[in-house]
Amino acid sequence: MSTDTIKRYPMPMPFGWFAVSYSDELAPSESRAVHYFGQELVLFRTEAGKAVLMEAYCPHLGAHLGHGIHERSGTGGGRIEGNNIVCPFHSWKFNPEGECVEVPYAKNMPPKVAGKKCLKSFPI
C-alpha cells in the first residue's frame, strides 16, 4: 500500500488484538516510544515483569514518557521505578493503570490527578 493511500485512508482504531512488540524485545525496567493507531504511546515493562502500553504524554507539562533522559534512565527510554514509569521533566510517577501515584515535590496530590486515571492504558 502506498504512503499516499495510507494518508488518505488511515486505519481506524482497531477492534481486537494487534502485536506491537514481541515479549522478549522488552526487558524488565525497559521502555520505548512507539507510534500505533495514529498516536504516540509508551511501551514499558515493570521491574516485576508486567508489560504495559499507555498514552505517552505526561498530563502535567506534556513530556513524552517514552523518551526519557538518557543520563537518568540509562537506556534513553523512560525511567521505570518498581511498577511505575517516571516523567523525565518533574518525576511524576504513573502506575500501569495510568494513575498518578506520586508527585515528589507536593505535600498533597494535585486535584488534577488525585485519585484519577490520567493516562489511558491498553490491555496487553
Located regions from the model:
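Rieske [2Fe-2S] iron-sulfur-binding domain
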Residues: Y22-I124
